[in-house]
């Protein structure tokens, strides 16, 4: 029998915290200014109208309004927030 415990149990037992990335608000939903729309690594989705890009590539709304996901060229996506008053007037 081994008189030492071995290295298996002492080297295990760690796990990193989850990052909670992804789309937080979907198209057609209403948001208030400062609401986080997408958490991402790099610009998977680009900032459109009334949307800013945070230091960690988080996209957030600058105005109150309705979220819309759109194409940006052939292979890119962008998210925009259009003010609710303008959205109701066009509907």
From Swiss-Prot:
Keyword Kinase carried by entry: no
GO biological process: translation
GO molecular function, one term: structural constituent of ribosome
Keyword annotations of the record: Ribonucleoprotein, Ribosomal protein
Keyword field contains Zinc: no
SUPFAM superfamilies noted in UniProt: Ribosomal L27 protein-like
Regions that span the bilayer: none
Ranges of compositional bias, category Polar residues: 7-19
One GO cellular component term noted in the UniProt record for this chain: cytosolic large ribosomal subunit
Gene3D superfamilies per the UniProt record, alphabetical: 2.40.50.100
Chain spans, region Disordered: 1-22
Entry similarity comment: Belongs to the bacterial ribosomal protein bL27 family.
PANTHER family assigned to the protein according to its UniProt record, in alphabetical order: LARGE RIBOSOMAL SUBUNIT PROTEIN BL27M, RIBOSOMAL PROTEIN L27
Annotated protein name in UniProt: Large ribosomal subunit protein bL27
Species annotation: Myxococcus xanthus (strain DK1622)
Gene behind this protein: rpmA
């Amino acid at each position: 029998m081994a008189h030492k415990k071995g290295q298996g149990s002492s080297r295990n037992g760690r796990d990193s915290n989850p990052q909670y990335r992804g789309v937080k608000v979907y198209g057609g939903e209403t948001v208030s200014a400062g609401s986080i729309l997408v958490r991402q690594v790099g610009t998977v989705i680009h900032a459109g109208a009334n949307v800013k890009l945070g230091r960690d590539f988080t996209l957030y709304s600058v105005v109150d309004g309705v979220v819309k996901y759109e194409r940006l060229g052939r292979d890119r996506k962008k998210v925009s927030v259009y003010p609710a008053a303008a959205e109701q007037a066009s509907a």
